[in-house]
Amino acid sequence: MKTLEEIRKIREEKRRELNIRVDTTVGEKEKHILVCHGTGCTSSKSTQVIENFRRLVKEKKLENVRVIQTGCFGLCAKGPIVIIRPEDTFYAMVKPEDCEEIIQKHIIDGEIVERLLCKDIDGTKVNKLDDLTFYKKQKRIALQNSGKI
């Protein structure tokens, strides 16, 4: 059993991590790479995407970058889905070989990888998951915290 003080310390550490995922103005120096690991994305090689990101983060010694396996984001047809926090950039149909480009261009150079942005129903590229027409009219209940917890 942990002491009350140890539990408080764990709570504060986790609260800081969650703030990066909930409040996009927090943690500009720290990045979280959220990778969907729902069944649809897993069948499209999201496990390899996660492994590649983790390997690259370690190889490049990116101490302020965390790779986080998440549950389903609810748009399986566009998987594997990767979201970079805190800016909430939404990449779709990410292949294992795309990880190097995302790490170099987005994480290190601070540039969006345009070719991996999701296209909306009218063909325009969308930077953020919530800007997709697919999500705009939805009231997400079961998936409201997807990628946050």
Predicted regions and their residues:
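Feature of Fe-S/electron-transfer and energy-metabolism proteins
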Residues: 1-149
